[in-house]
Each structure stands twice: as C-alpha cells, then as structure tokens.
C-alpha cells in the first residue's frame, strides 16, 4: 500500500516524463525519416480534406532519380511548418485564393508539361496554374475532397526542383495529373 501511495504521489512527474519521452522520440523519428530539401518534393493543398499519406505513397511510385521522399500536406499543417509551406514545390488552391498566394507561384514552362495537360490559368499573360478540379471532377479525386468551386495546381516560387537543371517538380505535376 505504501508503494502505491508513493507512486500516486509522484504521478505528475511520471506523466511529464512520459509526455517528454513521446515528444522526444517523435522529434527523433521525424529527423531520421525526413530527407533534405534537395531530395524531397512537397505538395501543399488548401482543400476540405486530403488522404495525405496515401497520396504521397502513390506519388512516390516511379519517383525521379535523386528524390527520396514525396510529402503531401494540407494547409492545416502550416502551424507546424510555415517554412515548409513557403518552400513547397507545388500548391493546390481554390480559385478564390489565387490572388492571396500569387506571389508564391512561378510561371509554368509549357514545354515541360505533358501534352494532355488540362486547362491552364493565365496570370499576367503567362500560364501559371493548371485546373485540377472543375467543381465536379478532376485529378486525384479518390485522395482529395476538394470542396466547392475550381481548384488549380501551381508551381512554387521557391521550389528547388523547378529550375533548368532539376525539373522534378514537373515530374510531380505529371504524376499528379494522371491520378483519378
């Protein structure tokens, strides 16, 4: 009885250690399983809901050489990783949010897009976004609940994979457009 009383009197200490241990191991696991920015592709989506893990696994199939990881996040994830949002390779946003994020987008290189690319959104005279949801149907509908209205896919302005020497972001665009 005395041992039980002693344990219960120190329960708060045990709980604090338990929480710190879980957070610490979660942090270590994140570091071990993550990849450097040069070796991962990141897609952020401002959608109703997204099956992010399933979509990431599907997009990782046949990934380009040099890419170790594809991450998919909803915009809700921003509270944990604002820098990740700013450096994302691709964004999916509703038509109503395009103006809000327009400084985060790069113009698309039409020569690197697949020939069957859906309708393009023009901003300031150049192709900038690809319509991936028209309000009723579109790309990756089995992974994403888009919500009302049209949604567009954009190339991130800070993407490390959209330059002349590395076009893995265009591979990710093509892989995403093929999903149903």
Locations of regions flagged by a protein language model:
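Solvent-exposed loop/turn segments at secondary-structure junctions
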Residues: 48-50, 96-100, 159-160
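A structural signal for short loop-to-beta-strand junctions that line the ligand-binding cleft
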Residues: 113-161
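Surface-exposed amphipathic alpha-helical segments
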Residues: 164-180
């Amino acid at each position: 009885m005395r041992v039980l009383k002693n344990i219960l009197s120190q329960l708060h200490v045990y709980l604090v250690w338990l929480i710190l241990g879980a957070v610490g191991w979660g942090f270590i696991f994140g570091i071990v399983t993550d990849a450097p920015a040069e070796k991962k592709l990141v897609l952020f989506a401002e959608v109703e809901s997204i099956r992010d893990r399933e979509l990431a696994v599907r997009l990782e199939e046949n990934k380009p050489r040099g890419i170790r990881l594809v991450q998919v996040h909803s915009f809700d994830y921003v509270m944990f990783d604002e820098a990740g949002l700013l450096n994302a390779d691709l964004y999916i946003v509703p038509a109503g949010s395009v103006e809000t994020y327009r400084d985060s987008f790069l113009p698309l290189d039409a020569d690197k897009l697949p020939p069957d690319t859906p309708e393009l959104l023009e901003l300031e005279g150049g192709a900038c976004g690809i319509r991936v949801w028209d309000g009723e149907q579109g790309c990756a509908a089995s992974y994403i609940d888009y919500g009302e209205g049209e949604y567009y896919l954009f190339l991130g302005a800070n993407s490390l994979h959209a330059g002349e020497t590395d076009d893995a972001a265009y591979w990710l665009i093509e892989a995403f457009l093929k999903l149903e």
